[in-house]
Curated annotation (Swiss-Prot):
The lineage of its organism: Bacteria, Bacillati, Actinomycetota, Actinomycetes, Mycobacteriales. Its EC number is 2.1.3.-. The biotin-dependent acyl-CoA carboxylase complex is composed of an AccA protein, which contains the biotin carboxylase (BC) and biotin carboxyl carrier protein (BCCP) domains, and an AccD protein, which contains the carboxyl transferase (CT) domain. Residues 270-520 form the CoA carboxyltransferase C-terminal domain. Component of a biotin-dependent acyl-CoA carboxylase complex. This subunit transfers the CO2 from carboxybiotin to the CoA ester substrate. Induction: Does not show significant changes in expression throughout M.tuberculosis growth phases. It holds the Pfam family Carboxyl_trans. It is an enzyme of class 2 (transferase). This is Probable biotin-dependent acyl-coenzyme A carboxylase beta2 subunit. One of its GO terms (biological process) is mycolic acid biosynthetic process. Belongs to the AccD/PCCB family.
Length: 529
């Protein structure tokens, strides 16, 4: 049973909470832009036509009063495209079955797909495939964003390949077509197992009337060329003919109810709430990430009953490892305690990951690391081979991994703690997180040392003012590029979450993971001893 020494009345807590709240406000301001879609003008126009927005459709599709875990909501932040990438993706329960829902937003440039839309769809498909989640596509899209077609067309074929591979793996794919599904978009219903179209609303064709006339000289209209009734009566592309949007959603729910879906993972044990208040998670991470904090304070507020069986507590103490349950699901946890990873921590992590694979237990990585230790003594002591051992174990582990960046995640430590490149099933960040090859001060300092050495080799004087300006510019650049808003916009995580929602988000992830089998491995790469 974990104990807590966190004092919510302390000034350090107040400062940390105020800083985190400020960062949350900044995140929420950007999320509001995604929620607004194309803005009041286009949303009102959409409603005036009798249509629902994608989030309204999702709300009616998922079970009443059940949560919806939205993924990649900040996609395209910092780009020339609307935040959210004209697409809503996430996991929700439909008739008790956890599904990946992918919904075009027609209020944003007609729901056309830009490069960030494609990345977001592919990430959603990857999550669905890895976790065995049925996919429901809520289709209303004008196809590719033509000005950026060179970035979309060639890689874009993967989203259709994904649908067929999902189907081949026994993972159902369902398309509810609410409006236009043209050109390449026509292959979304074409590649789906179940297709619902709406009377006088759904339009599915490879080429619209103007293009058909130009190519063949044939005169046609939307309805005769690709309307719902034609596809239901003649082409056979539509499996179900809905009268309106609500009817289409009703039919979609009935399709899911008839899937006879059975989870292949373990059933959860009875759930007990943590002993400590989740609201206090907002005041744990110091404003200055160089100040260490105890990750057990986080663990105590997210795991069932605040019960945590720590593994090797006296060895490699900069990394906390141990076993717990979260929303009833067994879980192994690796959490950075004092930033730097030494040889002992690397060996400890490697053994722990092997044990988790032996026990078929998912792993949660809580990031707050500046990387692996450097220096002559540590190089001689085998830091490279021990760090490589940990990365080897993370790379070849086959139990599901979830990563949560709560503080720093720098250098190869990001890799060893299962960063994005190591394919965690889910990766989220707190607003306090930062991730880069190294801290801004360190990187600018390295560049300064190199520049000074080069100047001395040429027999030149160092321009101190220019050096100071360079260091300030580089430090500012790295600081900006390491922030969660920027990284989330690039889809390097699956979302930036409120720390107080951590237990709920992780519980939903573990429940989604349990749709597929959980099986560890004993087949790791060669460990260099």
């Amino acid at each position: 049973m974990l104990q807590s020494t966190l004092d919510p009345n302390a000034s350090a807590y107040d400062e940390a909470a105020a800083t985190m709240s400020g960062k949350l406000d900044e995140i929420n301001a950007e999320l509001a832009k995604a929620l607004a879609g194309g803005g009041p003008k286009y949303v009102d126009r959409h409603h005036a036509r009798g249509n629902l927005t994608p989030r309204e459709r999702i709300e009616l599709l998922v079970d009443p009063d059940s949560p919806f875990l939205e993924l990649s909501p900040l996609a395209a932040y910092g780009s020339n495209f609307q935040i959210g990438a004209s697409l809503v993706t996430g996991i929700g329960a439909v008739c008790g079955v956890e599904c990946m829902i992918v919904a075009n937003d027609p209020t944003v440039k007609g729901g056309t797909s830009n490069p960030w839309t494609l990345r977001k769809i592919l990430r959603a498909n990857q999550i669905a495939f890895e976790n065995r989640l049925p996919v429901i596509s809520l289709v209303e899209s004008g196809g590719a964003d033509l000005p950026t077609q060179k970035e979309i067309f060639i890689p874009g074929g993967q989203m259709f390949r994904d649908l067929t591979r999902l189907s081949a793996a026994g993972i159902p794919t369902i398309a509810l077509v609410f409006g236009n599904s043209t050109a390449g978009g026509a292959y979304v219903p074409g590649m789906s197992d179940h297709v619902v179209m709406i009377k006088e609303r759904s339009k599915v064709f490879l080429a619209g009337p103007p293009l058909v006339k130009m190519a063949t000289g044939e005169e046609s209209d939307d309805e005769s060329l690709g309307g719902a009734e034609m596809h239901a009566r003649i082409s056979g592309l539509a499996d179900y003919f809905a009268l309106d949007e609500l009817d289409a959603i009703r039919i979609g729910r009935r399709i899911v109810a008839r899937l006879n879906w059975i989870k292949q993972g373990p059933a959860p044990a009875p759930v007990t709430e943590p002993l400590f208040d989740a609201e206090e998670l907002i005041g744990i991470v110091p404003p200055d990430l160089r100040i260490p904090f105890d990750p057990r304070e986080v663990i105590a507020r997210i795991v069932d009953g605040s019960e945590f069986d720590e593994f090797k507590p006296l060895y490699g103490s900069s990394l906390v490892t141990g076993w717990a349950r979260l929303h009833g699901y067994p879980l192994g946890i690796l959490a950075n305690a004092r930033g730097v990873l030494f040889s002992e921590e690397s060996q400890k992590a490697t053994q722990f990951i092997q044990l988790a694979n032996r026990a078929d237990t998912p792993l949660l990585f809580l990031h707050n690391t500046t990387g692996y230790m450097v220096g002559k003594d540590y190089e001689e002591g085998g830091m490279i081979k021990h760090g490589s051992m940990m990365i080897n174990a993370v790379s070849n582990s086959t139990v599901p991994h979830i990563s949560l960046l709560i503080g720093a995640s720098y250098g190869a430590g990001h890799y060893g703690m299962c960063g994005r490149a190591y394919d965690p099933r889910f990766l989220f960040a707190w607003p306090s997180a930062k991730s880069a090859v190294m801290g801004g001060a360190q990187l600018s300092g390295v560049l300064s040392i190199v520049a000074r050495a080069a100047a001395e080799a040429r027999g030149q004087q160092v321009d101190e003012a220019a050096d100071a300006a360079m260091r300030a510019a580089v430090e500012g650049q790295i600081e900006a590029e390491s922030l969660p808003l920027v990284l989330s916009g690039m889809l390097y995580d699956d979302g930036v979450i409120d720390p107080r929602d951590t237990r709920t988000v992780l519980g939903m992830c573990l429940s989604a993971i349990a749709n597929g089998p959980i099986k560890g491995t004993s087949n790791f790469g060669v460990f260099r001893m």
